[in-house]
């Protein structure tokens, strides 16, 4: 491809509303253009990259035995009402009416549509297992679209759905898809981690997320430094570093604390180590009108997902209001504690191993110090309530936990029978009786993968693509292309490289565009391999080669360029 025949839309300036580096560089490199909040047009340069992601995804899905389909973006409300998600999904679901006033939505996901297809097409266990996938535009009406493609409203997604007569078959396909996902991200040259995850609003019983590691990631990715254990922050089990509760060394005492409404103030004004404090959080219970006390250490954070898994706690998690606290306890949020608390209490594992600690006295502006379990109050129910922190023991008993930031690019679920039961999707089993199908679902954010790859690989000059993702593998930059000797050598090399199967961008802009601008544009776009053709080099029988990640260029004999690139470029 020649730049004279291409839409080369690079920009020098970074748009003011672009915050994360992938958004900035995709705009500056001419990959995308903003149409409206959370909506982007893909330009030729960006689309070449996304098509490469799609191609790898397709190859791995096909290899895993999945069959490609294409479902409508617009879905009838009846299916969502049948599954119960029409009311549950909330404002992210873009709803609309047709001219006949019938309700529809723009699909954020396709569980209902695919289950409807399966119940109409499948009748016997002999047709199973069946795994169908599509690569299609999705829409979620995010309240605050931000970070470019990282959290837009419209995006390209690969979503697959599998149907099974039993759990064993589902597990087999799930494992195969897990491996296929690992193959995809490995082939794309990404540093990623698959992690155990919560199933969230999709539902089901078992899931894994796939995260590309990047400092700009929105999610915490947890993994062991000595094993293959990995989970997201919602799912990671928090194991206390302590194994035995120390014996008491202090007497229980009531202390005036008028200037200690927060943990930080308690530590600063009263000299209590933060690990000797607790947070008493009052939440609404699953039973109407009941409040539950959840207690974590002062330097730990409550994990809301873990909390809502407790049968006593309402889902979603709702904190008690100040009025509810006053009515039930007689004190405000900054003075609460488990001693003489007239509520059901659940404490975190780390709290159960504390001694000589401080708690609110359930009296405004007063705390108890020197509190000890069993001596001053009984040990209540103990549960895993907190987020893990770096350095915690790994739950598998091997090593300690490391926390890095990650960008979620894939998620796979074992849905079980959640949707098939709701939509009555069943077949006749081997015994001739109806069997409700078990389902799996498997998503990859295709457009997000492009942005995540940039977040993982860039410098102050621009994007650094690997060979698998680069829009072009080779930038061919002639200096003084208008001269006959340079033009002939360049055109001949361009033809040879193209015939050899390389993806080449020939920068044939005229002499008004300086060599410095050409080099800067190719580095901004991130093309991995650059060949410079100059009259001086040709006079010596050489061309100049430079890799995007290297500081210095090297001279290459003209007759060795093709062999060199065939060995260097990964295809």
UniProtKB/Swiss-Prot annotation:
E.C. number(s) listed in UniProt: 6.1.1.15
Tree of life domain: Bacteria
Keyword Aminoacyl-tRNA synthetase annotated: yes
GO cellular component: cytosol
PROSITE patterns: AA_TRNA_LIGASE_II
Subcellular location, record wording: Cytoplasm
GO BP, sorted A to Z: prolyl-tRNA aminoacylation
Annotated keywords: Aminoacyl-tRNA synthetase, ATP-binding, Cytoplasm, Ligase, Nucleotide-binding, Protein biosynthesis
KW Zinc-finger (keyword) present: no
A single MF term (Gene Ontology): ATP binding
Catalytic activity: tRNA(Pro) + L-proline + ATP = L-prolyl-tRNA(Pro) + AMP + diphosphate
Enzyme class at the top of the EC tree: ligase
TM segment ranges: none
Function: Catalyzes the attachment of proline to tRNA(Pro) in a two-step reaction: proline is first activated by ATP to form Pro-AMP and then transferred to the acceptor end of tRNA(Pro). As ProRS can inadvertently accommodate and process non-cognate amino acids such as alanine and cysteine, to avoid such errors it has two additional distinct editing activities against alanine. One activity is designated as 'pretransfer' editing and involves the tRNA(Pro)-independent hydrolysis of activated Ala-AMP.
Assembly: Homodimer.
Domain notes: Consists of three domains: the N-terminal catalytic domain, the editing domain and the C-terminal anticodon-binding domain.
Family assignment from sequence similarity: Belongs to the class-II aminoacyl-tRNA synthetase family. ProS type 1 subfamily.
Protein name: Proline--tRNA ligase
